Amino acid sequence: AGALMPKEEKEVLFKTSRMDFKDLYDDLKNLTPATGLSTILDVMEENNTVYAVEESEKGMTLSHYLHLRSRTLTPAEARTLLQPIMEGVAQLHRSGLIHRGICPDNILLPIDGTARLTGYGTLALRTGGSELKSQLYPGYAAPEQYSAAEFSGRYTDVYALAAVCYKMVTGQTPVAAPQRRVRDSLESAHSLEAGVPTWFSQVLACAMRLDPAKRMQTV
């Protein structure tokens, strides 16, 4: 009683998605607690599905924090705030995991002040054109995530982290990747906010290149 039953024609997709979800959260449970990552407390199989228990934190999202601010952050402020997130992403990468959903909505600023990354998702959930309804974050999702024919990698998280930093120092969400592929109208951070040093602006631009091979490859 209470077991989740997929539609007959979706049974294979359901089983595959369930396995992918369990594998991901088992790995996250083994990895956390870790600096900059929201902790997975337990993973359970019941009712023909899988449940993951994630630590609940009091605080606000980075998105909400930026909305409340009256000015943009300086590059130094942005780096300080994102430092634990970068450490967490580096931990994911060393463990063979890729987040694929880094954005202001998935960065939590707890009351204790140490930012944590949440919003974990499977590959299929973070890939356009997959059999699942994808959950991508325009402006932060890398171009390769919009096609099932392209491969995401550590460089995908590099793009998203740079996009988040761009938002923090300019106050503007980056142009979404599909639009950039048609006409790349992404303005440099320095041109939008004169207080952003040219070198810092160039680092962000490099990390947000449309071609994954031309970006930094990891954090």
Segments (PLM) and residue ranges:
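AlphaC helix of the protein kinase catalytic domain
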Residues: 62-73
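Structural motif at the C-terminus of the N-lobe alphaC helix and the adjacent alphaC-beta4 loop
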Residues: 25-35
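Conserved short submotifs of the Hanks-type protein kinase catalytic core
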Residues: 47-61
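Activation-segment/catalytic-loop signature of the eukaryotic protein kinase fold
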Residues: 42-43
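Activation segment signature within eukaryotic-like protein kinase domains
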Residues: 81-82
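ATP-binding glycine-rich loop module of kinase domains
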Residues: 1-22, 26-27
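Protein kinase catalytic-loop region centered on the HRD/HxD motif
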Residues: 85-97
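C-terminal lobe helix-coil module of Hanks-type protein kinase domains
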Residues: 139-219
